[in-house]
Amino acid sequence: MKMPLLVSHLLLISLTSCLGDFTWHRRYGHGVSEEDKGFGPIFEEQPINTIYPEESLEGKVSLNCRARASPFPVYKWRMNNGDVDLTNDRYSMVGGNLVINNPDKQKDAGVYYCLASNNYGMVRSTEATLSFGYLDPFPPEERPEVKVKEGKGMVLLCDPPYHFPDDLSYRWLLNEFPVFITMDKRRFVSQTNGNLYIANVESSDRGNYSCFVSSPSITKSVFSKFIPLIPIPERTTKPYPADIVVQFKDIYTMMGQNVTLECFALGNPVPDIRWRKVLEPMPSTAEISTSGAVLKIFNIQLEDEGLYECEAENIRGKDKHQARIYVQAFPEWVEHINDTEVDIGSDLYWPCIATGKPIPTIRWLKNGYSYHKGELRLYDVTFENAGMYQCIAENAYGSIYANAELKILALAPTFEMNPMKKKILAAKGGRVIIECKPKAAPKPKFSWSKGTEWLVNSSRILIWEDGSLEINNITRNDGGIYTCFAENNRGKANSTGTLVITNPTRIILAPINADITVGENATMQCAASFDPALDLTFVWSFNGYVIDFNKEITHIHYQRNFMLDANGELLIRNAQLKHAGRYTCTAQTIVDNSSASADLVVRGPPGPPGGLRIEDIRATSVALTWSRGSDNHSPISKYTIQTKTILSDDWKDAKTDPPIIEGNMESAKAVDLIPWMEYEFRVVATNTLGTGEPSIPSNRIKTDGAAPNVAPSDVGGGGGTNRELTITWAPLSREYHYGNNFGYIVAFKPFDGEEWKKVTVTNPDTGRYVHKDETMTPSTAFQVKVKAFNNKGDGPYSLVAVINSAQDAPSEAPTEVGVKVLSSSEISVHWKHVLEKIVESYQIRYWAGHDKEAAAHRVQVTSQEYSARLENLLPDTQYFIEVGACNSAGCGPSSDVIETFTRKAPPSQPPRIISSVRSGSRYIITWDHVVALSNESTVTGYKILYRPDGQHDGKLFSTHKHSIEVPIPRDGEYVVEVRAHSDGGDGVVSQVKISGVSTLSSSLLSLLLPSLGFLVYSEF
């Protein structure tokens, strides 16, 4: 969609027609000399809209303004079109910034702008609004409780307090801070009004709710009094149709902004929410939240304007809501004014073009003051027209400023900065333009001479308005000395150059047309004649674009022949379809050039078909039409239709009608599709040279729904809790749902029964149903079968399976339960097997004496085991233990409770190794005796582990002594671990490393020195 344009031109008219020499003055609106390097103010920072929190502790606010200028600018501020009184102590200036101390809403709220000026003029900044933000607390009154029947929908009102600005965010607390409600398909918090909506209330919703409101602009949050929500239990919750209660309104938004639409419905079951743009595709930047209740359109554009619809649906009915989005646009420059220098007495065309929606208006400022509205026309500029100009484009949604300085020039012609070239080359028979560009104001008159001959316009010679001289059909006689004369009312000047005639450049061997197949090579010849005094270069272009041989990717396919100076042959290697087109060879010198072209035809697989459209969408088929793509010079033999579903990223060939799509066809059907499935389609063309690129994929479509035709598999079940019949099956995957409101019908009857009992399971992802019946006989055989259904009908039943209802829990308790205390942390429990056949496992429950029985730990073992080990127990602690027999229906009665005590903890002190001495072929390791503490088990001996360093396994020794002899290691180092042993278990380890090398480790020295008082050094 194109936006309307507004065009405004500025043309300046002089009040005087002639001027003599002048003296430069420094006040607004005067011209400048050639040497003048100053310039008017250019804004680098301008004030922006600012919100000052009323409760801020900072005590000041700053509005920024900074301009670049020479000489430095002077700043001034205005508020609501009145001057800011800088003599007031509350106002101060820092550079160009305005600082307001102790801001007061009554005195300081308003619209501000900054003026920056120097002797070249004055400019005015964009306007900025200073506002005061606040968020009042919620009222202190208690909020009444809300009672709702389970299964019904409800809304809790937030009713936010007074505030500014309106950019609030809302969340809801549940019972305490910071536990926030998580939004899902059933619960929704509107960011428009803050209300909490629940599609249907459940017992788990019971609690106290508080609306939590945040203002990001002033970084403040408040929350309401808690609202008690009390769900009222219902024996059966009744379904009711979808009812949209959160509706979006017609909105006007700005192009480039993000737009949020909210739509939420009450209903039981929870309604599904779908979004669409009526009669048009959804914007590519649109995103739908996980719950479906929020549609966000990012960076909205004019083409996204239109009617949007949300639809809520459940098994009981649907509801729809529509509203329109209107997209407006801030003013935006198409072309704006820039700093300009013009000659005195000339006209100025200064375009100022803006676009926007609605159409912006144009107004002008000169030196900070209103100058004109709309188009401004003046002619024959004077010094009074110099100054700082601002073009302002504005509509209802904002304004934009374009600033520029206008300087008026007046000086006699001079060639000092841009003299004529001393030597100009031109080819015989060609054309030459000799430039003459002096600096002068006003624009001078031009005349030319060759030698002593004055030149006048003719069929071959033309003097341009800008002073340039054009000569056509050049001959040798045109060589010579040329002089350009420039004159205005302030003086005159001239400049001279020499024209030298060269031989022309000509193509003498032109490229010729070529026809090849993809992957082959082609050669384009090119040779030229040229003036030997000049250098010749060849330039190749492809379809009008110069080939850059310096690019690495170019070397793959293009190569030039550099063997001969006058030869520019081009080799095209491994040609691809993209290399087909027109190749042009240009032979050029600094004087002239000559070109010749030829066409390269590359035959290959077809290009992608275009214009793919989907029509006649049905449950298992769609009709496709497309337009023929390029055959790349080889006739198309057939087309292939490919599909991709939402469940896969892979494209697959589709079955079609007709099965073979001939190359002259542009329509066909894709058949054997999955009903109610989202598909994308594309078409691929094939010829004798291969298969081409696929078409652009179609828009995603959904096939019509149909009744399921696949039965659930793996139907079975059984087991479970007493008086239950558990039926299981493998849920059908999404591709077999075939329609909306998908679920299962479960049928079952006693094995010898006549009448099937049927129940409906609405959860499409479940594979389990449990039927409870207090009159059901345990371990009774049932026949069961399952079928799928959707809103289009029922599918076939599965094969009948035979399962048993849950058996009774065991009725006997294990007997002869006994325990054996193994250590401070382990107890062994044993019992006599229960003779009932229905026992599948045993459960041991145990708890410490200081704990409640409800906190008991459990250990489960199979029915073939008659003992179990309890580990990780507390030392020196009373424990209670009981054993029960269990099966899938539960556990039977427990045995009598056994009381026992764990032993005291093992010694906590490690043995202190006092020596490790080599004696012959053995090491003698000696340690101090470990004395147990009063709350530890008495030491009964020591365990020594002799193992290779880096390994965990080794040889274990036991002793009642305080030393042990171990063999000298043959290879590497060994570790000797020593620990005390007691009835409570093993104590803490001490260790020492030994090896076959006769040295004493530094770690061992630290052990020996304090106890022995001297260094023992042994050498064997």
Curated annotation (Swiss-Prot):
Query: What protein name does the entry list?
Result: Contactin-1
Is GTP-binding there in the keyword field?
no
* SUPFAM superfamilies associated with the record: Fibronectin type III (SSF49265), Immunoglobulin (SSF48726)
Q: What is its main location?
A: membrane
Q: Which residues form the Fibronectin type-III domain?
A: 608-706, 711-808, 813-908, 909-1002
Region (Disordered) spans which residues? 695-719
Q: Which GO terms describe its cellular component?
A: glutamatergic synapse; myelin sheath; plasma membrane; postsynaptic membrane; presynaptic membrane; side of membrane; synapse
Q: Which gene encodes it?
A: Cntn1
Q: Which residues form the signal peptide?
A: 1-20
Q: Would you say which domain of life the source belongs to? A: Eukaryota
Query: Which Gene Ontology biological process is one annotated for this entry?
Result: gene expression
Propeptide segment residues: 1002-1020
Q: Which GO terms describe its molecular function?
A: carbohydrate binding
How is it placed in the membrane, per its record?
Answer: Lipid-anchor; GPI-anchor
**A Pfam family hit:** ig
Q: Which residues form the Ig-like C2-type domain?
A: 41-131, 137-223, 241-326, 331-407, 413-500, 504-603
Tell me which InterPro entries the record gives: Contactin-1_2_Ig1, Contactin-1_Ig1, Contactin-1_Ig3, Contactin-1_Ig6, FN3_dom, FN3_sf, Ig-like_dom, Ig-like_dom_sf
Subcellular location, record wording: Cell membrane
Q: What does this protein do?
A: Contactins mediate cell surface interactions during nervous system development. Involved in the formation of paranodal axo-glial junctions in myelinated peripheral nerves and in the signaling between axons and myelinating glial cells via its association with CNTNAP1. Participates in oligodendrocytes generation by acting as a ligand of NOTCH1. Its association with NOTCH1 promotes NOTCH1 activation through the released notch intracellular domain (NICD) and subsequent translocation to the nucleus. Interaction with TNR induces a repulsion of neurons and an inhibition of neurite outgrowth.
Residues with a covalently attached lipid (GPI-anchor amidated serine): 1001
Q: List the disulfide bonds.
A: 65-114, 158-211, 263-310, 352-391, 436-484, 526-585
Q: Which family does it belong to?
A: Belongs to the immunoglobulin superfamily. Contactin family.
Which residues carry a glycan? 208, 258, 338, 457, 473, 494, 521, 593, 935
Assembly behavior: Monomer. Interacts with CNTNAP1 in cis form. Binds to the carbonic-anhydrase like domain of PTPRZ1. Interacts with NOTCH1 and TNR. Detected in a complex with NRCAM and PTPRB. Interacts with TASOR.
Natural source organism: Mus musculus
Q: Does the keyword Membrane apply?
A: yes
